[in-house]
């Protein structure tokens, strides 16, 4: 069983092909805050670590949404939405269980 936690974003995006990795039981898709450096950010890191401590032996994957996280919301938000939607589609296609 694979569960996804995501921000409510949905715009088409093609996910690049990467090396095959085992599917986690739970996949967190996290968009860092505006102005934060690339990655999950401090809140995303804390959330993922807290979740891992609560799910027993289930595996937790973490995906940092790739977007500018800038105050230019007209370009930043759509880019983040596209990347997050692409990751959701990628996980659904490659980790259907």
What are these regions (language model features)?
Residues 23-96:
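Active-site catalytic motif of lipid deacylating hydrolases and related acyltransferases
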Residues 1-7:
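Sec-dependent N-terminal signal peptides
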Residues 7-26:
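C-terminal region of N-terminal signal peptides and the immediate post-cleavage residues
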């Amino acid at each position: 069983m694979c569960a996804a936690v995501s921000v409510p974003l949905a715009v088409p995006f093609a996910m690049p092909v990467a090396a095959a990795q085992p599917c986690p039981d739970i996949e967190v898709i996290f968009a860092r805050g505006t102005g934060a450096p690339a990655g999950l950010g401090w809140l995303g890191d804390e959330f993922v670590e807290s979740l891992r401590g609560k799910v027993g032996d289930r595996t937790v994957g973490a995906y940092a949404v790739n977007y500018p996280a800038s105050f230019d919301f007209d370009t930043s938000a759509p880019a983040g939405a596209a990347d997050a939607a692409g990751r959701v589609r990628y996980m659904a296609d490659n980790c259907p269980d």
